[in-house]
Amino acid sequence: MAAKLPTVVLLASFAAVILSLAAPLLAGDPDMLQDICVADYKSLQGPLRVNGFPCKPEANVTAEDFFFPGLGKPADVYSGNPMGSAVTAATVERIPGLNTLGVSMARVDYAPWGGANPPHSHPRATEILFVADGLLEVGFVVATAAPASSRLITRVVPKGGVFVFPRGLLHYERSVGEKPAVAISAFDSQLPGTQAAADALFGSSSPAVPTDVLARAFQVDGGVVENIKSKFQHK
């Protein structure tokens, strides 16, 4: 055993070095290379293809680049809103000063008794949700060791409670109280991205996911799939 100890120590040291080098790669966004890099929307030509926006010249930076008043105003969760919920995002698309800082926030308003933020995921960020008012049932789906098996991690979160949704996992929130609910979420990405499961499969994908693929996946008739698709507004 004594002869093997140096090898074990060497392997452990090597693993520690690899983990320390990999740690920055596990962050939601890349590390920043300067104190500030306020997004310069006007200089962007075509769609964004990098992890961040071009930087505005520092001489042109103002306090307004780091300010957003939108999270203090309730959103309409009733008018033509089948989900009974509304998200107000405070990402780099609305706060240019967030560029390269790797954080963002959102406010979610829910109608009482059933207002839901339907199953969705954030491919680029972990979310921590704070219930500012009301009562929310929340949950996320995690894969288990059994083949093709998943488990729902769920609970009711009261006012003042906090719940964490791990990065990339499908999750939802639903109001279960008799008054409107409000939640504030924080993300470890300037632009976490949101992919709503139902809309991605049945609605906004272009081209659309083939009906026969969905029929086989959900083990239903193609007519059922077409009926569901008809309820979504295709982009």
Swiss-Prot record:
Keyword presence, Secreted: yes
Function: May play a role in plant defense. Probably has no oxalate oxidase activity even if the active site is conserved.
SMART domains the record matches: Cupin_1
Name this protein carries in UniProt: Germin-like protein 1-4
GO terms under biological process: plasmodesmata-mediated intercellular transport; regulation of root development
Location of the protein in the cell: Secreted, Extracellular space, Apoplast
Disulfide bonds listed in the record: 37-55
